[in-house]
Amino acid sequence: MEDQRPPLSWLDAFETWEPVLRLMLAGETERAAARPARVAGRISQYGWSLAHRGSLSATARTRVEDIQRALARGKVQEVAFRAEVRPDGRTTLGLVWPSPVVEPAVGYPDLGVLVLAEGSLPEPWLRRPDPAPEAVPAPSADPELLERTLRERLPDAVGATAEEIAAAEARLGVALSDELKALYRVARVDWRGDFEGADRVGDAVGCELSGLDDLYAVDAERRHSGWGHGAMRALSTAPDAAVQGLAGSPGWIGFGSNGGDEFAVDLNPGPGGHFGQVILVDHEQSLGAELVADSLTDFVLGRRREERGGRRGNTLPAVAKVGSGFLETIETAAHGALEVLSIGAWDGAPFSLAPLAGLPRLRTLTAAPGTLADPLEIAGFSGLEFLELGVRDWRVLLDARAVPRTLKAAAIKVRDQDHLPVAALANEILALWDRPQIAQTLIQGDLGPATTAR
């Protein structure tokens, strides 16, 4: 049957976008004041993000859905757009197409984050666990009691042999805790469609139990949600923390779930933890884990912690924000533990970055347009891996050949007047790392002159 969806080339016609642009321009006052109006948005196969308050008109909704069908037919995930509309109606529309070097991110309607180093991750996701050679099991850890309890609850279960457990240890590259071995000596878990058996074991253990062959180490890279979010995060391990501040660890051995979150036995606990404690890895979080039981014995016997802790979020001193409503000086934020600094909107004099010189852990810097006194001060920061600046500040760095080569990812913060040149500027940044260029289609059209309200 003939495909009735519009072809992808249909998106190159100005008329395709006219209903969407008119919707987004409704109520704008810029053109009536003899100034260009600018709009931006993003449409994907499964949704859209348009700077428009209220519901879509029937005409605009139909057109958006047609655009979605064209994207689906062309097997293109999404298209971002920006338009500049002059008072007389002449319009320049820029379409930005998906690129393998761009991570779409909230707050970046037309581009996203430029990935400069293939496969790179922010530092917290690369962090390895500190050795814990002195860690011992909790007093409540009792492999014999655990095994006896499970045999009483699961009298017909088939357990794993010593050889099978040893093979699992060899595959994982770690020695399992005595409690975890005791659990699998009772039930090796090989369902083969036996859902009732799975339910019985789940009830006995207290979670959806994975099979011995399915044990895994919680992988930090799998939890990475993208540079736009990850570059702004930091984790630390307090001196008395039970769980180390990590994204993942070879010593976090996932053995079950609650249907969404993961339960793991922790073989690399924090300074205040115990070897073999049970932690929860929240599927809605990309960093950290929470202590839920001091031992697997406690976990199975239902002696779980009511008050959980262990996650460290965006708290000073590792993460700081300067600007209106936050810290008012760079000096206040600058200290040896600082990793992430965001400079937001500010009505005062632009900031000097001199107080940041020499900070050993500074890896992320974001600055709203117009907030930096001298962008070239950035050239002296030797450890930056993520940088977000406005168009003019990037222009200064590019012209001076002073873009830090330590960067792994970057972003361009856009203000009204900077709309359409962003893709070209991004391509200049990408070229420094020999990365593929972003494709942009420029379309000219006419929406007619602005109407003056009476």
Where do the model's predicted regions map?
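An N-terminus-focused feature that recognizes amino-terminal "leader" regions
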Residues: 2-69
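A surface-exposed partner-binding patch
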Residues: 51, 126-259, 369, 391-408, ...
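Hydrophobic, ordered structural segments
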Residues: 77-114
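Compact, glycine/acidic-enriched structural inserts
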Residues: 279-309
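N-terminal segments that cap or nucleate solenoid repeat domains
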Residues: 311-355
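Conserved hydrophobic beta-strand positions in leucine-rich repeat
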Residues: 317-320, 339-344, 362-368, 387-389, ...
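Inter-repeat linker/turn residues at the boundaries of leucine-rich repeats
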Residues: 336, 357-360, 370, 379-382, ...
